[in-house]
Amino acid sequence: MGVSKLDILYRRLLLTKLFIRGWGRPEDLKRLFEFRKMIGNRERCQNLVSSDYPVHIDKVEEQSDCKILDGHFVSPMAHYVPGIMPIESVIARFQFIVPKEWNSRYRPVCIHLAGTGDHHYWRRRTLMARPMIKEARMASLLLENPYYILLKPKDQVRSSLKNVSDLFVMGGALILESAALLHWLEREGYGPLGMTGISMGGHMASLAVSNWPKPMPLIPCLSWSTASGVFTTGVLSKSINWRELEKQYYTQTVYEEEIIHMLEYCGTDSFKMGHEFMKHFPSNEDKLTNLNLVSRTLNLDMRDQVVSPKHAECHHSGKASISATSKGQLLQDTAKVERLNQTLTTNKSCFASYNPQSLHLLSREQRRSNLQKESLIFMKGVMDECTHVANFSVPVDPSLIIVVQAKEDAYIPRTGVRSLQEIWPGCEIRYLEGGHISAYLFKQGLFRQAIYDAFERFLHKYAN
């Protein structure tokens, strides 16, 4: 399946750059990776936010068909990783849109997390929450993203996060903030409760639901299993300040000497395939301009991933096991298996062979090429560590998950990435024609229908 030309054109029209200041402070990355281990385990994470966590309502506005409540609370992230959030983001803000009348004895609420660039509430309120009031008498709670609008650092331009680490701070904050709001909604007598989001919002909703200890409808729209492809092979990768990332990776050895060793994710689409990437990346490539080339060099053109028994041991208990298809493939193609096993069982020390101290002996073109390779692999590694859903608990009931994905999405690559159906057995995936932008503009009705279907599925299965 090809990619949407509209997605590519739309990205070219946007001039903003991502991660203009680089990776973020190494000490911040270390703290975030340690925190990821905590929130990646539901048994540990579910106790981080108490059931009586304080939430405050600031304003109530009565309208003809609904009430609109604005509220705030202190982000729990500020308690667990103090000092890592910008001061502007410490106070989380939300808007709660409640129908004047309900269709039944239930009072369903869906939390909507924001996608990239979705500042404030008006877009989600207009395109999703208002129609949901009219169509299904369903309430919507819109949580503002950290780093957006009132929560945006003063020196940040629009949605352009300054550091790679900012994305991980945002994700950790949204997981804990969602838990605080879910507890509050339960205290107020609402239910059933579910979560959704479009693009980045869908991915953040997936991570939040993975840590909720009860069955919950989840409807991630235009998102997939990891953000690593978004920032290495998707069209957004063209907006990244790679020069600064490469420079920092070269000048600060802490990234390869310490931080790489903290990366634990080892699925079949792991960054440990980087050894194969090193072998095949063309030495004369000066810019990351060909996304298909990047996909090939990251081994993303392999339709069926296989994994060695030794590698399978690195999965945490509860992760999806190797499929029968993969086992069959293992027997069919010995040469391919040997090459992959060598790649997949290579430990993190493979990066140490590319010592920045020795790069001065190479030609300028070779140094540039090697830095590109290592920076791209490191980006995949840190993104998989903090965003891959396989690094988090499986939601309590995957049958309540309906994923809506665009077939030609150039923002969210699926090639070479583990399928959500493999990670969440029993979930449903609905594919739409077209790409990311066209789906966002014209398929909101299908997103809402998926929400209604998931909530109906919950009531059919769990209603008293």
Swiss-Prot record:
Cleavable signal peptide: 1-24
Keyword Secreted found: yes
Annotated glycosylation sites: N341
Primary localization class, coarse: secreted
GO cellular component labels: extracellular region
Family matches, as InterPro entries: AB_hydrolase_fold, ABHD18
Domain of life: Eukaryota
UniProt keyword terms in alphabetical order: Glycoprotein, Secreted, Signal
Protein localization: Secreted
PANTHER family: PROTEIN ABHD18
Similarity section: Belongs to the AB hydrolase superfamily.
Protein's name in the database: Protein ABHD18
Organism: Rattus norvegicus
